[in-house]
Amino acid sequence: MNSTETSTPTAPAAPKRADARRNYELILTAARKAFAEGGESTSLEEIARQAGVGIGTLYRHFPSRQVLLETLYVNEVHEVCRSASQRDDDPWKALSVWCQGLIGYLTTKRALAQELLKYLDEDAALFQECRRTVYAAGEPLLECAQEAGVVRPDVEFSDVLQMLAGISRMPANDPDQVEHVVRIALDGLRYRPQA
């Protein structure tokens, strides 16, 4: 049931009333946790129960499972991308810390993305907008590190994303191994003058 027309690249606006906003956030928090733990087997009724709200309240905020999934996905992408704006004075550290955060996001949100692909094609507007958001956040970090002479000049941001996407597919049951591979991969980006 793939459809690109129903997808919007931005999440529904959070409600303005304090109680409605609280319920909205409770639902998102419960859904984030439920999808991380149970994946596709998670029912909306279970999410409402975990959030401490009625199913009608959940549907008022999120009229379908797809809308809830899209909102979670967009919010998570924006959260990881916002961290890029909290730059460190050290361009290498700024890039590497952000890449490690993106790996953490990609690794833990794999199930969420797979669930969304039941509703959307890979080239849906939602995914395209999220890719643009990731590029807008990460590309300046790479360029800054290259200008500082700490990252190889032949590296494109698309190379970095491909590298991180590959690492994110590693089994997540050994975080130390994932961290080790991330360090090796990031070390491969470093500029080393020829002797």
What is each model feature region?
Residues 1-41, 45-50, 67:
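Basic, helix-initiating cap at the start of DNA-binding domains
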Residues 71, 82-108, 122, 126:
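Hydrophobic alpha-helical connector segments
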Residues 43, 81, 111-117, 150, ...:
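Short, hydrophobic secondary-structure boundary micro-motifs
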Residues 103-140, 165-173:
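Short secondary-structure transition hinges
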Residues 129-133, 147-162, 171-176:
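All-alpha amphipathic helical-bundle segments outside canonical DNA-binding/catalytic cores
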Residues 1-11, 97, 104, 136, ...:
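C-terminal peripheral helix-coil segments that are non-catalytic and often amphipathic
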Residues 62, 69-76:
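Alpha-helical DNA-contacting segments of helix-turn-helix folds
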